Regions:
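Short, non-transmembrane alpha-helical segments in secretory-pathway proteins
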Residues: 78, 82-103, 244-258, 300-341, ...
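Secondary-structure junction/capping motif
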Residues: 53-54, 60-61, 308, 369, ...
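Short helix-loop boundary/capping segments
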Residues: 374-406
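N-terminal Sec-pathway targeting helices
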Residues: 1-15, 23-26
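Extended hydrophobic
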Residues: 393-397, 404-407, 426-473, 477-479, ...
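A short, surface-exposed beta-strand/turn
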Residues: 175-194, 284-295, 357-383, 454-484
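Preferential activation on post-signal-peptide N-terminal prodomains/segments
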Residues: 11, 20-311, 319, 482
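Exposed beta-strand-loop-beta-strand "reactive/processing" segments of non-cytosolic proteins
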Residues: 250-296, 324-377, 427-457
Length: 484
């Protein structure tokens, strides 16, 4: 950030004034609380990064070396046992490469995936230097600026070669780190077993196809027999019972965001929102939009260094464990922010598949993702969540009979009809997920990303074809530790 001292002072004064006005509006009627009381202690359980940063990933694929893959989302908030094992191996591989140079090369997915491996996939680009911030002495001979895949190929035994590939799927460039001394590699090797989810199996397009259109490696589900019967989802509001807000449920969650919680701090404002506050924290729940919002004003006006990428991720995940109402798995969907703030965006996942919020839901809640966590100065400054959970119906009440290749054909046809006549030269992504456009009977859809458009394709051929088209934002690189 390019600031001189005068500009810095002005900005701080303006921010404090804005915060004061906001605090007056939100805390009206709570005059017994001194808004600017200096509270130096922070809630350690919410703000500390863990001792061993787990490997962040949107999703990860496990390959058994025999062309069988399983795809998972984190089964704990922000991590999983498998990701923790993978992180141990990656740290050992990188540590062994300190002082060594790497060469930029083209990614060969067939070679990468022919052995047991774990592939971390991200739905956004990550700056290479930021990710390796803790290992500045690692050399990257011909710089790989950013990546969206990490593939770890562990050795069967200590003394054999383990590899870590960082891949940029846009350019197909990669760098490879090799190590012979990883003690954790054999543990990960034994744990890597692909376990298909019932009738659904995954293939790697990088290993199985040579199509010029599918240039990026994608892990896509397919079925030997169709139709495939599955459970729809229903939406469960986190703080409601019998159609009304439960104060008990709300207070049980609210108390975990405060050091010394008291129900005397709560009120309902003129808009019907439930507000809990003390001298530094405001927690608000809007029953109309079902938005839960947390603000910590201790961090406003601070101008410290930006929190490291992985530290901020762990701080976000640790903070979310304080939300007792969060009962659905979440995954990292994106990272953004500006100045010394980093924003981590999360979405829900059920039964190993993502839940995508419809555009109408996004407009209602004012967010593109289900959860936003803003980290500044190694603390959570803001937490916003669409406070619902999703659960399976348990009834096998929906049917799927459209494979991904058919969905791609349908999206291609829609592109020609609704956007422009153009030969599709690159498919950015194909994903299967639940489309949360209702509260009951939430079904699976194909989401096909062609250039700057996402097409929703029906998975049940007996239902009317979707014509929904969503414009996407240009893909940017996450730069989460360099001030600009």
């Amino acid at each position: 950030m390019k600031r001189n001292r005068i500009t810095n002072v002005i900005i701080v004064v303006l921010v404090i004034a804005a915060v004061y006005q906001t605090g007056e509006l939100w805390l009206e009627g709570t005059a017994g609380h001194n808004f600017f009381r200096a509270v130096k202690e922070s809630i350690s359980a919410t703000d500390e990064a863990s001792e061993s940063d787990a490997l962040l990933a949107t999703r990860y694929a496990v390959g058994d070396g025999a062309s069988n893959f399983s795809v998972y989302y984190p089964d704990k908030v922000g991590s999983s046992d498998m990701l923790e094992k993978a992180n141990d191996v990656l740290q050992e591989i990188l540590a062994e490469n300190i002082g060594e140079s790497t060469e930029l090369e083209k990614a060969d997915w067939k070679e990468m995936l022919q052995n047991k491996c774990i592939v971390m996939q991200y739905d956004f680009m990550i700056n290479m230097d930021d990710y390796l911030e803790g290992m500045r002495s690692l050399k990257n001979g011909q710089d790989l600026d950013s990546f969206d895949y990490i593939t770890i190929v562990p050795a069967r035994r200590t003394g054999e070669e383990s590899k870590a590939y960082f891949v940029n799927s846009q350019t197909n460039d990669c760098v490879v780190y090799r190590a012979m001394k990883s003690k954790s590699a054999p543990i990960l090797f034994e744990a890597l077993q692909a376990e298909p989810e019932g009738e659904m199996v995954y293939i790697s397009t990088g290993q199985k196809t040579s199509s010029a259109v599918l240039r990026r490696n994608l892990f896509l589900p397919q079925w030997a027999e169709l139709p495939y019967q599955y459970d729809t989802l229903r939406q469960v509001p986190a703080f409601e019972q019998d159609g009304a807000v439960s104060r008990v449920l709300l207070e049980n969650t609210a108390e975990r965001f405060f050091r010394n919680f008291s129900v005397d701090w709560s009120q309902r404002d003129e808009n019907g929102n439930f507000v809990f506050s003390d001298s530094s924290v405001v927690l608000r729940y809007n029953p109309g939009s079902r938005m839960l919002e947390y603000y910590n004003y201790e961090n406003y006006g601070s101008d410290g260094p930006k929190t490291a990428l992985l530290d901020g991720y762990q701080i976000s995940c640790n903070f979310m464990t304080n939300d007792a109402s969060l009962q659905t798995d979440v995954y990292l969907a994106d990272i953004g922010g500006s100045g010394n703030e980093t924003v981590y965006y999360f979405d829900y996942a059920v039964n190993g598949l993502p839940v995508y919020l419809s555009e109408s839901v996004q407009q209602e809640i004012g967010m593109k993702h289900a959860i936003e966590v803003t980290v500044s100065n190694n603390s959570v400054k803001k937490y916003r969540r669409y406070a619902v959970n999703y659960e399976a119906s348990g009834a096998k009440d929906a049917s799927l009979d459209v494979q991904f290749i058919d969905a791609l054909d349908a999206a291609n046809r829609l592109y020609q009809e609704t956007v422009e006549q153009r030969e599709i030269a690159d498919v950015k992504n194909i994903a299967l997920g639940y489309f949360a456009d209702r509260t009951e009977g939430i079904r699976l859809q194909w989401f096909v990303n062609l250039y700057d458009r996402i097409f929703l394709i029906e998975t049940d051929s007996t239902l009317p074809e979707q014509t929904a088209v969503t414009e996407t934002e240009p893909e940017t690189v996450v730069n989460a530790s360099t001030n600009s």
